């Protein structure tokens, strides 16, 4: 893979991130509670709740991940106090609390909120991660996917010469 995106649902589903993922040499973006697991795997720690279930004004640093993302209010469900390792930088904050962080040398990124589908910044952040950080290209369209599937089927040796392909 060219990159990994980790998402976590609830604090009650506490898990431990296998630190070997960090040594694969591919970019990792951890969202929500997965960001807490990432910071722990990087040698940092999480403490008590800093912001809980309220809107907060977020300021973003001009980084590759947050290129073209403007600061503004966002609802934050649960934001913890983070103790960052020495080589990790704060890339977004709200009221003095770390909201996002990165280790740009190892391409490890964490954001303490989930990306919502109706938030225009979410698609920008995902695009920045996929294209600018992971080096992926936006080749996928339904026509391209169908052409690729047809090519794979025609390259395969199908007995009788017919195949049924369902797309959902």
Label for each model-derived stretch:
Residues 8-12:
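Short glycine-rich anion-binding loops that position phosphate/pyrophosphate groups of nucleotides
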Residues 1-6, 16, 22-24, 40-168:
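RNA-binding accessory domains that recognize and position tRNA/RNA substrates
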Residues 14-35:
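Short alpha-beta junction capping motif
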């Amino acid at each position: 893979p060219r990159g990994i995106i980790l998402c976590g649902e609830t604090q009650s589903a506490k898990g431990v991130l296998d630190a070997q993922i960090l040594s694969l040499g591919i970019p990792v973006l951890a969202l929500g509670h997965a960001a807490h697991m990432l910071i722990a795997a990087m040698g940092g720690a999480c403490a008590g709740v800093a912001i809980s279930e309220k809107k907060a004004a977020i300021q973003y640093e001009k980084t590759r991940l947050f290129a073209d993302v403007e600061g503004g209010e966002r609802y934050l469900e649960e934001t913890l106090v983070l103790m960052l390792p020495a080589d990790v930088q704060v890339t977004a904050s709200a009221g003095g609390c770390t909201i996002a962080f990165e280790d740009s040398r190892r391409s490890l990124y964490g954001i303490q909120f989930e990306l919502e589908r109706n938030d225009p910044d979410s698609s920008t952040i995902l695009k920045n991660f996929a294209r600018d950080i992971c080096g992926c290209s936006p080749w996928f369209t339904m026509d391209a996917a169908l052409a690729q599937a047809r090519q794979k089927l025609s390259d395969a040796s199908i007995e009788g010469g017919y195949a049924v392909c369902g797309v959902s």
